[in-house]
Amino acid sequence: MKHRVQELDEILSRLSLAFIQLERSGKCCGGVTLSQCHALDILSKNGELTMNELSRQMGLAKSTMTRIVNTMVRKGWIERKKGEGDKRLVSVCLTSDGKKMTETLSQSSKEYVQRILKNLPQEKIPEVVESLRWIVRSVEKEVCTSC
């Protein structure tokens, strides 16, 4: 068991570093940061969200989310809307350019996953997918209990 813990720790660490390197290189999403990719994806699936809702779904502090949103507003991908009754309530939604960017990113993501799958033995893919599902559930459960 001790060996398995160490082995999984090393694998998860390498995976995390690989994603960090991918984001820093700007290649993961065509020059778009990974956080921007996730925010665009969440907005494309949910439509208009308040900043609080988007921060919660991203798992980020509101101040961090605000910086990400500011950049995406400047790039013309999303727009802010003030609340009708409460002007302090701010929501965000995709612009037409944001929707186009989301479609581009979705296609890039699919191509990236296809390249990864080509490097795996075809008969192992279902097993890999199921294992990743279990890992994600376990990590999400741990994140939720440590908040």
Task: Identify the role of each PLM range.
Residues M1-G30:
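N-terminal leader segment of winged-helix/HTH proteins
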Residues K2, Q6-D9, Q107-C147:
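Terminal interaction helix/tail motif
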Residues S16-F19, T102, V136-E140:
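A structural signal for well-ordered alpha-helices, especially hydrophobic packing surfaces
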Residues L22-T64:
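N-terminal helix-turn-helix DNA-binding core of bacterial DNA-binding proteins
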Residues R67:
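DNA-binding alpha-helical recognition surfaces that contact promoter or target DNA
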Residues N70-E127:
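Charged, amphipathic alpha-helical coiled-coil/dimerization segments
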